[in-house]
Amino acid sequence: MLWSDALDQKAVYWRHSAARYKATIDQTGSLPRSDWWRYEYCQTPYLMLASDGYLGQRWLDQYNNNVRLTAAGQIAPREDFGDERGMFGPLFTHLTMEFGTRGGVPTNLISDGNKMMNKYFAKGEPTGVHLFQGYPETLDGVIVKFGQREHIEKMLKNGEVRITPSTFYAQPSLSKAMRDLESEREFHHPAFDAVSAGRTRAKTTSGFEGAIEDGFIKETVRCPDYVLWCACRDIDRRMPDDFSADAALIISKPAVFASRFESGLKKLWPRVKIKVGPVQYYDPCSFVHRNERPVHLKHFQFAYQREWRLCTFPTASQMPASAFNIELGTLSDIAEMVALPS
């Protein structure tokens, strides 16, 4: 990308806008929360050099997280739009501000976003609405494993769990809801100064050097391969269709389950390290999670899944070539199964 007079004008526009918000702060001592998000973007308009394609994918990723299926089978906004770290409110605001300098959010993106949700109604009532009929909108303090009835039955009766190498999820054949490079995470460093100077490569403040793309230096952080088991932290009614599931196991005591799982793995790998808990979702354009390992960090496009995972780190010689099962014993004392009629 080459710097231009048009980009100069945009940079001036953002500086002037930031100055107006700053003047309001000086006069009143505060701003409404949404204006703080706007002020934040005016100070650092990190999407200013991004391509329309980059912005479009970012828009669809946030849209995918800001809608849900209700127990009645209706599409509704997520109630946790402003999550505990305030990710999606600012993200949405910054996108609409940048699109505002480009003529507004393209209508095709609105249409594509609607299509993503309409797929749940392709066969009539969404599978998750039928599967969780009679359940409340949400269930707190549980983890939920989605899958085929025969596998969920084995998990309930025998505690049969399938452990998967992280490399498995890179397969192109997997659905978008499942496919991810689990041992890699990207961070996008704005490169305004380098682009304005006419450079096509630049270094980050941490010393990483790379090509400039979409106005960013895109750095990939990697970790060694590992094995994992995943579940969700709610009875989200989108999940059954996303994972082609006709059944689910609702585990009411995640800590007890994790303890049994760890004991089972220790029999296989006595000295193996294990990490258990909820996934932290991150924005590649933010560096809040820059120093965290990829194993419990995922791109915000997956945040609606509210994933809980158990990761274990066998040595290279112990690393399995493919997924395998272990049995933990019956889980009927800490879990219940729901399934579509057979």
Describe the function of each predicted region.
Residues 1-342:
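NAD-dependent ADP-ribosyltransferases
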